[in-house]
Curated annotation (Swiss-Prot):
Protein task: One of the essential components for the initiation of protein synthesis. Protects formylmethionyl-tRNA from spontaneous hydrolysis and promotes its binding to the 30S ribosomal subunits. Also involved in the hydrolysis of GTP during the formation of the 70S ribosomal complex.
Ranges of biased composition (kind: Gly residues): 236-296
Keywords per UniProt: Cytoplasm, GTP-binding, Initiation factor, Nucleotide-binding, Protein biosynthesis
Predominant location category: cytoplasm
Compartmental location: Cytoplasm
Similarity-based family: Belongs to the TRAFAC class translation factor GTPase superfamily. Classic translation factor GTPase family. IF-2 subfamily.
Residue ranges with Basic residues bias: 300-309
Ranges of residues in domain tr-type G: 421-581
Name used for this protein in its record: Translation initiation factor IF-2
Species of the source: Mycobacterium avium (strain 104)
Pro residues composition-biased segments: 139-169, 193-207
Length: 914
């Protein structure tokens, strides 16, 4: 036994029990725990000697199987076919021991020598015949390795004999030709009788009867001598799936032909499920069914379900868009939000987003699956697939978002008995410098804020009125529109000496769009040149007909500076409110309102001026406004006093937001901070998607070349003192139209001072920071100087717009215009070791200047462009220019010149772009 041996293997070899072996080892001083323990080779040798196995037993166990097989082969070749059963059993035992535990052994044959394998029974014995049938070489017997090819040295360790210890190994003899499976010369075959197997019980170590040797490693070959050649045309036993055990006369299925008396060859072939039938058609391999763990038998084809058939039919009927087959709709409506991606669309129609991407690519538009897509693209793609794509408006989208949390906005809860009278909300609108703010100062005798509430006596009863001021600048269109939507009555201020101006018309349009009644205040009647009747005539063109002209619009002539007719104006406001409006609200519900303005205060954080429209806002309520949320920590009225609650039509400053809300965002009170945060997060994501879809520039395959060209882009970061100013500045800057070569992009915007975060973002994106009525905080200025970030400060919005427009014009690629200078004809060519080739020229027209651009003409064909006149000499002097009619020498840095060529000189003049 080579190497270490286990105790139970030694016990089986010696024919004793494991306990006896363990006891004997303990007597010899070897500490062995159990029958599965291993012992070294010297210990095993001493153990065999102690049991009296002698050198014969040791030699049988230690000698390689090759020597034993060679001896048997010699005996068979000499004709000694009547070997006793004991010799045969000893040879088989030696072969099994030498082959190891994992080798396959033959099951015991049935009494009488009948084989157990049907394939072996069906194969009759026949004498071997020379010829093509004997061309298959026989394999070595079990226990005998394959003999080496002629001229190849045998493997070391193949010599027989006992091995009591390290001893020199004698050289192996050259095997006979007949035992070499690779030799072309084969011995004359003669029938050799099989040795009679000994009947009895199966020996230890032999496989169980009926076990399949196909699951065992292959053996080198049979025990006997050269094998009997196969019969021509007969099927090979065991070809294909592994079968049952064969008889003693059956050769291995895929083994190299076993000799006479070899152990039974089971089904050969691949490892698979045991018990499969071997064979196939005569002369061919069996099928591979069952091989590599595959189930045998013919594959089953089940019937398709109705759903599978329907899916196949729908796929065949699906429309092909851009060469891609897509799902076919039934005309149903698909609702998508603004800035939806192809993944969102694919999820709605149960399609693959990659198919939609490929379809759009084939149609000429390049987008990704997660990229925001414009509304037109979604509608076009949906119409091709027979879907009606409906892009949800922002109002509907926000309403659906609130409904998902069981919330509503814009409706009073309760019955008619729960509604109570509220003060009117009045917005003052008009053109810039027409006296809006002065009018409010006169009304409240103090500086006005964004929203104020004053008390007016009407019919002997004091009634409060809430005023909202709006800017009159052109850039603040959105603020005027918000003021018109949040108000009940609009006061239109028109200067009597100036007349109707563009912002006046815009304010009229906003008020009429919001269906708000208008009271006209004709201001500055005390100024020289004032004509109130002219104002009435001009406003008639816009549908504002005075009552004295038979209309329903109240006109009041006032002077905000002198305080003239202010009471009549307030009286007109209350009369209009009582006549045309139902000013009632339910104060016993959760508060709802609108953020008029918002800014970032250094000491208090985000501060929002909120107008409560219905319900009551209290300190401690969880609120959400746009994409900002928080909890009310403090409320301040227009006088700077703290208040605990705010009733309908009451303006207050709310402190407690986590971020600055947008001007015009709806305010809503919710039950928990968690709900407020979820609503704010979803609104923020929706806003980002909509902004990405709006700012994405469509790139088609037709203009791909132009899109890939370098485009100048100016990145800006906007910071302002309040949200309305930042919004107005951004809209004004985005409205600048210069050229397609330059682009303006606002990468960030915010309320408050310029921070180090803004500077870092500007440094990373090569942006310019615009500060409107704000300054840099802390070390932001030092960081900007160190990083080279430019910060511009403005307090007038028009100045910022003009400078940004000039910067964009400076980023345009310059346009150069060619200005012809003169022509020179080459009369002679000189060569110099210092300057190279010199052209001796005559100036035929114009003037030639040094360092000017030149082109070389030969027979009126341009030979070279974009040359430079490096040097210019007249006689021996260096000159800057040579005029017509004079000779000169010049160098162009170009060697391919000939006499008669013409040098044309020109200069490029940059043309200013407009």
């Amino acid at each position: 036994m080579a190497g270490k041996a286990r105790v139970h293997e030694l016990a089986k070899e010696l024919g004793v029990t494991s306990k006896e072996v363990l006891a004997r080892l303990n007597e010899q001083g070897e500490f062995v725990k159990s029958a599965s323990s291993t012992v070294e080779a010297p210990v095993a040798r001493r153990l065999r000697e102690s049991f009296g196995g002698g050198k014969a037993a040791e030699g049988a166990a230690k000698a390689p199987a090759k020597a034993a097989a060679k001896g048997d082969a010699k005996t068979a070749a000499k004709g000694d076919v009547k070997a006793p059963d004991k010799a045969l059993d000893a040879a088989l035992d030696n072969a099994i021991k030498a082959g190891g535990n994992g080798e396959a052994a033959a099951p015991p044959a049935q009494p009488g020598g009948t084989a157990t394998t049907p394939a072996a029974q069906a194969t009759p014995e026949a004498p071997a015949r020379p010829g093509p049938a004997a061309a298959r070489p026989s394999a070595p017997a079990p226990g005998q390795p394959k003999p080496p090819a002629p001229g190849q040295p045998p493997r070391p360790g193949a010599t027989p004999g006992p091995r009591p210890g390290p001893a020199p190994k004698p050289a192996a003899r050259t095997p006979r030709v007949g035992n070499n499976p690779f030799s072309s010369a084969q011995p004359v075959d003669r029938p050799i009788p099989r040795p009679v197997p000994r009947p009895g019980a199966p020996r230890p170590g032999a496989p169980r009867p009926g076990a399949s040797p196909g699951n065992m490693p292959p053996r080198p070959g049979g025990v006997g001598g050269p094998g009997r050649p196969a019969r021509p045309g007969a099927p090979r036993p065991g070809g294909g799936r592994p079968g049952g055990p064969g008889g003693r006369d059956g050769g291995g299925g895929n083994y190299r032909g076993g000799g006479v008396g070899a152990p039974p060859g089971g089904g050969g072939g691949f490892r698979g499920r045991p018990g499969g039938g071997g064979g196939g058609r005569p002369g061919q391999r069996g099928g591979a069914a069952g091989a590599f763990g595959r189930p045998g038998g013919a594959p089953r084809r089940g019937r398709k379900s109705k759903r599978q058939k329907r899916q196949e039919y729908d796929s065949m009927q699906a429309p092909v868009v851009g060469g891609v087959r897509l799902p076919h709709g039934n005309g149903e409506t698909i609702r998508l939000a603004r800035g939806a991606s192809l993944s969102d669309f694919a999820e709605k129609i149960d399609a693959n987003p990659a198919s939609l991407v490929q379809a759009l690519f084939n149609l000429g538009e390049m987008v990704t699956a997660t990229q925001s897509v414009g509304d037109e693209t979604l509608e076009l793609l949906g119409s091709e697939m027979n879907y009606n794509v409906q892009v949800v408006s922002p109002e509907d989208e926000d309403r659906e978002l609130l409904e998902s949390f069981d919330l509503t906005y814009g409706e009073d809860e309760g019955t008619e008995e729960d509604l109570q009278t509220r003060p009117p909300v009045v917005t003052v609108m008009g053109h810039v410098d027409h006296g809006k703010t002065r009018l409010l100062d006169t009304i409240r005798k103090a500086n006005v804020r964004e929203a104020e509430q004053v008390t007016v006596e009407h019919d002997g009863v004091e009634r409060p009125i809430t005023f909202i001021d709006t800017p009159g600048h052109e850039a603040f269109t959105a603020m005027r529109a918000r003021g018109a939507k949040a108000t009940d009555i609009a006061i239109l201020v028109v200067a009597a000496d100036d007349g109707v101006m563009p912002q006046t018309v815009e304010a009229i349009n906003h008020a009429q769009a919001a269906d708000v009644p208008i009271v006209v205040a004709v201001n500055k009647i005390d100024v020289e040149g004032a004509d109130p009747q002219k104002i009435r005539g001009q406003l008639t063109e816009y549908g504002l007909v005075p009552e004295e002209f038979g209309g329903d619009t109240m006109f009041v002539d006032i002077s905000a500076k002198q305080g003239t007719n202010i009471d009549q104006l307030l009286e007109a406001v209350l009369l209009t409110a009582d006549a045309a409006l139902d000013l009632r609200a339910n104060p016993d519900m959760e508060a709802q309102g609108v953020a008029i303005e918002a800014h970032l205060d250094r000491g208090r954080g985000p501060v929002a001026t909120v107008l409560i429209q219905r319900g009551t806002l209290r300190v401690g309520d969880s609120i959400v406004a746009g994409d900002a949320y928080g909890r009310v920590r403090r409320m301040v009225d227009e006088h700077g006093d703290d208040v605990e609650e705010a009733l309908p039509s009451r303006p207050v400053q709310v402190i407690g937001f986590t971020s600055v809300p947008g001007a015009g965002d709806n305010l809503l009170v919710v039950d928990e901070d968690r709900i407020a945060r979820q609503i704010a997060d979803k609104r923020s994501a929706r806003k980002r998607n909509a902004l990405a879809a709006r700012s994405r520039k469509r790139i088609s395959l037709e203009d791909l070349d132009s899109a890939l060209k370098e485009t100048s882009q100016l990145n800006l970061i906007l910071k302002g003192d309040n949200a309305g100013t930042v919004e107005a500045l951004e809209e004004a800057l985005m409205g600048i139209q210069i050229d397609d070569e330059v682009a303006l992009r606002v990468i960030d915007r915010g309320v408050g001072g310029i921070t180090e975060t803004n500077v870092n973002l500007a440094s990373a994106s090569d942006a310019v920071i615009i500060g409107f009525n704000v300054r840099a905080e802390g070390k932001a200025t030092e960081l900007a100087n160190r990083e080279g970030v430019e910060i511009r400060y403005y307090s007038v919005i028009y100045q910022a717009i003009d400078e940004i427009e000039k910067a964009l014009r400076g980023m345009l690629k310059p346009i150069y215009e060619e200005n012809q200078l003169g022509r020179a004809e080459i009369r002679a060519i000189f060569r110099s070791s210092k300057v190279g080739i010199i052209a001796g020229c005559m100036i035929t027209s114009g003037v030639v200047r040094r360092n000017a651009k030149a082109r070389l003409l030969r027979d009126n064909v341009v030979v070279s462009e974009n040359l430079t006149i490096n040097s210019l000499r007249r006689e021996k002097d260096d000159v800057t220019e040579v005029r017509e009619g004079f000779e000169c020498g010049m160098t162009l840095g170009y060697s391919d010149i000939k006499e008669g060529d013409v040098i044309e000189s020109y200069e490029l003049v940059q043309k200013e772009r407009t």
